[in-house]
């Protein structure tokens, strides 16, 4: 195999290392542990520069995985549940933290979405 084919194979493997999640109909709510909250501006997500907020964390379950949610639309600090643009409900469980898989997915998500400007707002997010 020549270098060109190896490079294409590498690009393919990198692209499939982050995959789509179940539909909202199949998975209407999700619990995130070891979570963070990020503000995002610019890139493909908000080319107009408007802020979007995203939860990043780990989903426990039969196939636990790192997860980045679509833009948070509403958040209830009492229940620690947020509804995202997709309509999925995310519950932030336990204390904030860092998960290696979640942070890997986050870094890939940022790259895929044009490396927008990012700020970790976990400690200042209202009601968290």
Regions found by a protein language model. Give the residues of each.
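Cysteine-centric segments in proteins
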Residues: 2-81, 88-128
